[in-house]
Amino acid sequence: MYYPNKKIEQEVSIPYPLYQAKKGEYFIGQTPKLIGENQNILAALVNPIDSKVDLYVNAITVTNISTLNLSAEFYLRATLNEGIVSDSVSCTNLGIIPEPIPEGEIKYLTTVTEPPQDGVNIFSRIVSSYSTLVIDGGQIIISPGQSLIVYLGGFLPLEFDNVIVAFGWWEETIYEYPCCHC
């Protein structure tokens, strides 16, 4: 049947990370090319203690630009107080001006000799030479004062030329509700 006076309603389903990108709250970034120089490397997505947001990790990549395989160990609940903050981070919605600034930071250290002493090693991977390991799914939420650390070169020889670690995440404000005494 045809109803000329009725409007057709439409519903469009989009992935939640795309929704966050549309709002200007999805960020992506990477470390520069990191060289171990007979040391191990730490790369991390860090949520500063005063951020007032949760970071929802959507993607982690480890790109091994080397002739040798590389080990990557992933830690939660570990602290990284030191490190260089990467400036290669951007909001993924290029239409928002001024560009939103993320609370989360990508940090890295190239002079470590052992894995994080605190925290939990949640999984490990081998990254083949001249390849990229991609981990996606959005199951990790980093609250203020926490981080996700990638420790490189832990259980394979410390001979790798270049590696790049990248993170994709969105940020959601933590709302504090006043206590209700009803």
What are these model-predicted stretches?
Residues M1-C182:
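Beta-strand-centric surfaces of beta-sandwich/beta-rich domains
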